[in-house]
Amino acid sequence: VIVLCPSLDKVGPICRGVEDCAIVLSVLNGADPEDTSSIAAPFRFDATAGISGLRLGYLPKAFGAEATAVDHAALAAARRLGNEVVEVSLPELPYGSLKNLMLAEAAATFQALTLSDQDDLLRWQGDEAWPNTFRKAWFLSAVDHVQLDRLRYQVMLALDGLFAEVDALIGPLDTGPMPLASNFTGHPCLHMRAGFLELATRPPASVTAVKSEAETGLKSRVPQGISLWGRLFDEGKLLALGLALEAALGVAAELPRL
């Protein structure tokens, strides 16, 4: 694990199934005396507990014209689980501006790399590549940083308000501001396999891109995911919901041919 942006960076499991994620997360969880940002928060997960009584929210625009058949199938499967599924909304905020806070932290972390010109050794040297984003961050003022911290707090309040209404949020990974916002607030996200689409090879994407358009070429059966976001320190409930949704979708057992 390499530190990029200390106030955002977090360690999480990457597994073939939801229950495996719960097992790995139970090992990762806990406070580390060498890490002053770690918290001694409990982690509770019971694979047999069930998910009755949960309230699941979704942003309508996330399932609009750009949503895929896999996205819609995942929402339909969530409805079949028997819990209440409701439309929700988030306040209008300049969520995208938070990227500048991330770039400033990353530039500070890799200051020595920039000042020594060792970033010239990095293979990717495009306009949107790290060497140039590090340098651009140096033009942010102290006033900019204070205002960005204020915005971050507003986003924290917005997501806390959302999860006061629902137990979890479902949607594609690029659901509204959620990928960016939840990174800055710490709200947990479970991204899981939901189905497959026939797609061509996609081009490389920058750190700020969530989706990239497929290029022309030979198409393959590519796995697609759906995301679940939940309350702070409530990963157990999120994983229980993911486990039930995984069973309803019935695609987790399909593995790539080697």
What are these model-predicted stretches?
Residues 1-72, 247-258:
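A short helix-breaking turn/cap at a secondary-structure junction
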Residues 9-16, 135-140, 228-230:
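Short, well-ordered beta-strand elements within core beta-sheets of diverse protein domains
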Residues 13, 222-234, 238-242, 246:
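Short, well-ordered beta-strand elements
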Residues 46, 65-89, 110-121, 145-167:
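Acyltransferase
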Residues 50-59, 100-156, 201-226:
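Short helix-loop capping/hinge segments that flank enzyme active sites or metal/cofactor-binding pockets
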Residues 83-100, 134:
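Short connector loops at secondary-structure junctions
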Residues 183-184:
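Short hydrophobic alpha-helices that are characteristic scaffold elements of the AMP-binding
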